[in-house]
A protein has these predicted regions:
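Residue-level signal for inorganic ion chemistry
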Residues: 22, 40, 87, 127, ...
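Active-site ligand-binding patch in enzyme domains
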Residues: 106, 152-153, 158, 162-207
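Short loop/turn motifs at secondary-structure junctions and domain boundaries
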Residues: 31-35, 44-45, 156-158
Length: 207
């Protein structure tokens, strides 16, 4: 591999690593951000992480705002890695694009466009018009998996439902000896899914 190609490969690998961290940050806050999607953000300068941010509890502030607020260094010409397209409109918070432009961030990577029509695809143009390099689609499949429930809810106007059923190998739900057939591993998964959900529906007997 030539030096030029090697440098390109190294940059691409670093970009993926930074975005993986952003995705991990988003996943850690998933289910705790109200109606807003959980977003992760990493800011890098000279190949060094200088700040991170997540969507706040109940959805505010946004991850980009938190990452900028958390940073004590000059953000000029830094790179921002964010899991979802930054917002570009005024709502309960100012546009993240405005904050990015104001702080002279030089390059923005995001995994995928937001499904919200107020945002979708518009941030790309806004940032480019302000001389900020923009690249989208980095680790898009991972982001699609992370935002499956959010996109389903916005597109279908329906709740995203996860069903959990425990059965034994012989397809019996429980025996007279013991009603519990799950182990500690499956119990941990169940509690994790409950943590990431907005509501839980159970039978009266479960209580």
């Amino acid at each position: 591999m030539s030096r030029g190609l090697g440098d390109v490969y190294k940059r691409q690998t670093q970009d993926k690593d930074f975005m993986k961290l952003a995705l991990n940050l988003a996943n850690a806050r998933r289910g705790l951000t109200g109606n807003n999607p959980s977003v992760g953000c990493v800011i890098v300068k000279n190949n060094r992480i200088i700040s991170i941010g997540q969507t706040g509890y109940n959805g505010r502030p946004h991850a980009e705002h938190n990452a900028i607020l958390n940073c004590s260094e000059n953000l000029k010409d830094s790179k921002m890695y964010v899991t979802l397209e930054p917002c570009n409109h005024y709502g309960k918070t100012p546009p993240c694009t405005k904050n990015i432009i104001k702080n002279k961030i030089g390059e923005v990577y995001y995994s995928m466009d937001d499904i919200d029509l107020k945002v979708k695809g518009k941030s790309y143009s806004i940032l480019r018009e302000n001389n900020i390099r923009v690249k989208k689609g980095l680790l898009k499949k991972d982001a699609e998996n992370l935002y499956r429930s959010y996109f389903f809810n916005r597109k279908k106007k329906l709740p995203y439902v996860i069903g959990k059923i425990a059965v034994s190998k012989n397809m019996i739900i429980y025996s007279e000896i013991s009603k519990r057939i799950t182990d500690k591993t499956s119990d941990k998964l169940t509690h994790y899914l409950r943590l990431k959900s907005d509501g839980i529906m159970i039978s009266g007997k479960t209580l």
